[in-house]
Structure formats: C-alpha cells, structure tokens
Amino acid sequence: MINNRWIIVFDWETDSPNPDTCNPVELAAIPIDPRTLEIKEDRSFYSVIKPPGITKETYFTEERQKTIEWHAKQRGVESSDIIKSWKAGKSEKMAWKSFCDYCKKFNSEKSPGNWYTEPIPAGYNIIGFDLPICSRLAEKHKTKMPFSKVNKMDVMDLMFYWFENLDEPSSFRLDTMRKFFGIQAAQAHEAYSDTVDTAKLLVQFLRFHRRQAKVDKFKGAFKDK
C-alpha cells in the first residue's frame, strides 16, 4: 500500500468567500515527493487570474468590494493595488488549462494495485472550498479534474484529528495553526505563501506518522476483542 503518487498542495484566492459563485484570482501549487516528502519549491505553480467582468463597474458588488478590502488589509496595500494586480492576470480559462497541464506532469504510471495515476490533491480546507472550485472550473472549461478523485489530503481535517480533544490551539484556521506551530508566514492569505506553509504542516505530520506506523503495531490489533 506504499504511496508512489505525487502530492500536489494547492490554494485558491478568490473574490468572494462562496466557493459556488466566486471568481478565482490566484492559484498556487507545490508538489511533494511521495517517497522522500521533499517539498519541491523549484517545481511550483503560480498564477494571478483576471476575474471575468472586472473592467466593468457592475463587477464591484458590495461583497466583492469587501473581499478586495480584506485582501488589501492582509497584504498591507491599497484596494486599488489589488484591483490592478487582478486586472493584469491571465484569463481564467488560460490559467486553469495551464494548471491542468502542470498537474499532468506529476501523473504516475499504472501498475498492479495502482490504477489511479493522477496526483493526490492536498491543502487547507480543500474539501469545503478549493476542490469544489476545481470541479466547477473543470465543468465550465470542459476538462477533466487534474487530481485523484479517490484520495485527498485536507490538512484542516488532519489538524482536527490531532487537536479535537486539546485546549489548544484555539481554532482550526490556518492563521491560528501558523501561530501555534511557530510558522513565520511570508505573506498570509497570498496563494503561494499559504501553499508553502500548508505543505510544511503536512510534511511534518506525515513524517511523524511514518515514524509511528509499523505493520506489527496494527496487524491483528482487533483480534479477540
């Protein structure tokens, strides 16, 4: 059952908090070698995306304006800087197809017992937020999902497994986890920075799990119980 499929940690930044209606504005991804657990920053992906309609006044709904202000506050810039950056981004279709091509580079070969070749998606709250966006874009732009549909590694769920019976940390937000573990964020809520920090958390716990996981610890553990 040894995993030989690449793990792709990824993160969307968007123009609203609703995964069903938002427009992506940033996408970052970074691969993790499945055997060494090395974070391959030199093989990362990053794209700023121009949301459809941003050149029109009707784009700037109250919700989007609040989201733009939030992004600006997180990065210590003006709202106009955020808008300028988004306007200079790639089209959504181009960014998504580039990302799909990027993920294909990490497909594995089929072998006995390994019928799923796509990389394993990983990230923070990807089940509730990022993966639904991927599904929506795949349907919209008529592509396949670039990830495995079977396995997924949501680090927020992983944190819940470990800390659900402890007083700390105070929440399961990524910012809270950064502070708790002493991770110095280069730029919180920027897609690439969030991706790198999530990858660090995932790798740390995977290494810990591997040190603990032995066949003889588990095999037959429920026998005669």
Per-segment meaning from a language model:
Residues 80-87, 142-147, 183-187:
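Short, polar/flexible loop-turn hinges at active-site or ligand-entry regions and domain interfaces
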Residues 3-8, 13-124, 189:
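Conserved non-catalytic scaffold segment of RNase H-like nuclease domains
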Residues 153-168:
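Short alpha-helix plus adjacent loop in nuclease-associated cores
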Residues 129-153:
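Substrate-recognition/cap helix-loop segment adjacent to the acidic, metal-dependent catalytic center
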Residues 14-16, 36, 157-160, 197:
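Short, glycine/acidic-enriched loop or turn micro-motifs at the edges of active sites
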Residues 10, 124, 153-156, 193:
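Active-site flanking residues adjacent to catalytic metal/cofactor-binding acidic residues
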Residues 118-127, 132-133, 137, 167-225:
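Acidic, Mg2+-coordinating catalytic module of metal-dependent nucleases/exonucleases
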